[in-house]
Amino acid sequence: MASLKDVQNQIVSIKKTKQITKAMNMVASAKLRGAQDRIERFRPYADKFYEMLGDLAAGADSSVHPLLEVHEEIKTVGIVLTTSDRGLCGSFNANMINAALKKAAEKKAEGKAVKFYCVGKKGAAAIKKTEYEIVEAYNDDMTHFDFNLAASIGNKVIDAYLAEELDEVFLVFGEFVNVASQPPNTLQILPMSSDAAGEEGESGANSEYIYEPSVEGLLAELLPRFVKVQVYRGLLDTSCSEHAARMAAMDNASRACDDMTETLTLLYNKTRQAAITADLMDIVGGAEALKG
């Protein structure tokens, strides 16, 4: 049985750990509010952008812009994987990595090569241990990022697609549904898929709008930006999801600390009671021996 001092030291250690987890929970909560504010401010712009672009693309032939064209042969697939730079966020990073590897395995089974663009240290570290090539790794960028990061990633995959170094590009990100749900999402961003278009785009060109100078000219300007907007929205979602997952993980850790403290306190009391009982037995035994 552990000594009283050992049990007491464990209780003190666990209480200190709880102080850390509670502080991390509060920090994650504050960061989540900031990330939610960013994504809520960006969503109206993104939604209207998708609606307009979907309408334009539906009313135009795919040959008007190379980013709309499906390559005749799909030989190489690019996957943009977004994860966090830091851990302590439960199974969040593992879920993102597993979703990306699942898509990679599907494409490999079809005889296609797979290349990765990793945003976040955790994703890059995991993919390095696999057979897949990492074209670009963006480390320490998920902590503080802006649209410039999305533009940089977007430009690289666009250049690779136009040069036919990539034939399809997928984005894997954590879709922020709410504080309790952040499922991984895999979205095709190149070539532009019908899923990315708004409901207006799915039904064809909107005859109420007159586009100047031309649909083709607008698509040439908007399609590259569409890719960057998609990437940026994925980064925002992943950032929100990371903070929500870390907040939940730290809350669970704090609860576990409470349970362990309760268990160890009970053990401490039992150990102390046993020690007192043993001392009393020694005293009684000594007294009886003196009487005899």
Curated annotation (Swiss-Prot):
It is found in: Cell inner membrane. Its main location: membrane. SUPFAM superfamilies: ATP synthase (F1-ATPase), gamma subunit (SSF52943). One of its GO terms (cellular component) is plasma membrane. InterPro entries: ATP_synth_F1_ATPase_gsu, ATP_synth_F1_gsu. It comes from the Bacteria. The keyword Protein biosynthesis does not apply. One of its GO terms (biological process) is proton motive force-driven plasma membrane ATP synthesis. GO terms for molecular function: ATP binding; proton-transporting ATP synthase activity, rotational mechanism. It is a peripheral membrane protein. Produces ATP from ADP in the presence of a proton gradient across the membrane. The gamma chain is believed to be important in regulating ATPase activity and the flow of protons through the CF(0) complex. PANTHER family: ATP SYNTHASE GAMMA CHAIN, ATP SYNTHASE SUBUNIT GAMMA, MITOCHONDRIAL. This is ATP synthase gamma chain. It comes from Maridesulfovibrio salexigens (strain ATCC 14822 / DSM 2638 / NCIMB 8403 / VKM B-1763).
